């Protein structure tokens, strides 16, 4: 795509900054759940929290939190999506050899799983070659798939979902490209919107950025995003959620504010705390209807060895 050509230098520069910040030795942060733990904050999902979340369903309304995936949608280079629909052996008329005049479509999907609405697993990002629970990348990451920290190990993520409307707190429909979201911003929004975050909750931030720009200005949408600062990721981790997400493709601000490390929110959440990241979530309706708590349900495709997965969680209230 022309987008990739246009933004390749910017993205390369950001990656160089990130790599330069991670070449030094990193301290091992062991899991709260033991040396053999591979699912991190998903350990916080339990029957009591699931039952409590189910009680949030008052109107019987369900809403898809995954946006539509369009093969033409820009993605972080070199990621892409290609879909082919075929009719093997029959092409609408040829005899399928099944004893009746059947016709069918099949599909072939070629894509990077870190595209569109997605779940970042604990094997996605580390620092200096080290990942969640002191796992060394060279020991579990192979071209054929991860042997630890993979998507297929994650149990269904079910619990209380919480929406924090950052755009409303800022008095705008959409935050601007690269606009930082600090812990003070999050705390102020929580106070104004009477939002509390409990252990095991799934926290979603609404910036309005995807609703405003994905279709109207895809190059802007893919080139930079508003997002949390490094210290805001530490604050969010201190709330002990199961997952943190936003309606942007990266969660942290890109480019980062001065003094921050690009994408380092991923290290804080994934590597240091085992907290999952949800990207490009469809939060617009929740914000428009002031739905700040809901039941969240996610059962991702269990592709063995996968790092990430395209997802469509459901919010119910």
Residue ranges and their predicted role:
Residues 1-12:
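Bacterial N-terminal signal peptides that target proteins for export
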Residues 1-2, 16, 90:
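Short non-domain terminal segments
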Residues 26-317:
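Active-/binding-site microenvironments in catalytic and ligand-binding cores
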């Amino acid at each position: 795509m022309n987008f990739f050509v246009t933004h390749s230098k910017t993205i390369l520069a950001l990656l160089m900054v990130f790599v330069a910040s991670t070449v030094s030795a990193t301290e091992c942060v062991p899991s709260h759940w033991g040396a053999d733990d591979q699912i991190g904050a998903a350990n916080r999902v339990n029957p009591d929290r699931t039952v409590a979340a189910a009680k949030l369903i008052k109107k019987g309304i369900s809403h898809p939190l995954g946006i539509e995936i369009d093969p033409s949608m820009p993605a972080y280079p070199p990621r892409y999506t290609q879909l082919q629909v075929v009719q093997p052996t029959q092409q609408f008329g040829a005899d399928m050899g099944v004893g009746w005049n059947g016709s069918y479509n099949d599909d072939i999907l070629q894509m990077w799983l870190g595209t569109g609405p997605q779940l970042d697993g604990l094997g996605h990002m580390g620092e200096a070659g080290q990942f969640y629970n002191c796992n060394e990348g060279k020991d579990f990451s192979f071209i054929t798939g991860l042997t630890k920290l993979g998507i297929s190990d994650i149990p269904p993520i079910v619990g209380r979902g919480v929406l924090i409307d950052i755009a409303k707190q800022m008095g705008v429909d959409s935050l601007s490209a690269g606009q930082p979201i600090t812990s003070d911003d999050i705390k102020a929004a929580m106070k104004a919107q009477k939002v509390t975050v409990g252990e095991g909750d799934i926290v979603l931030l609404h910036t309005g950025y995807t609703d405003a720009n994905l279709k109207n200005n895809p190059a802007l949408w893919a080139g930079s995003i508003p997002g949390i600062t490094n210290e805001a990721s530490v604050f969010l981790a201190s709330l002990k959620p199961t997952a943190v997400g936003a309606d942007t493709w990266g969660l942290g601000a890109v480019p980062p504010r001065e003094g921050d490390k690009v994408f380092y929110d991923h290290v804080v959440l994934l590597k240091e705390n085992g907290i999952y990241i949800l990207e490009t979530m469809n939060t617009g309706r929740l914000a428009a209807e002031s739905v700040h708590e809901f039941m969240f349900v996610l059962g991702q495709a269990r592709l063995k060895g996968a790092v990430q997965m395209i997802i469509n969680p459901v919010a119910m209230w």
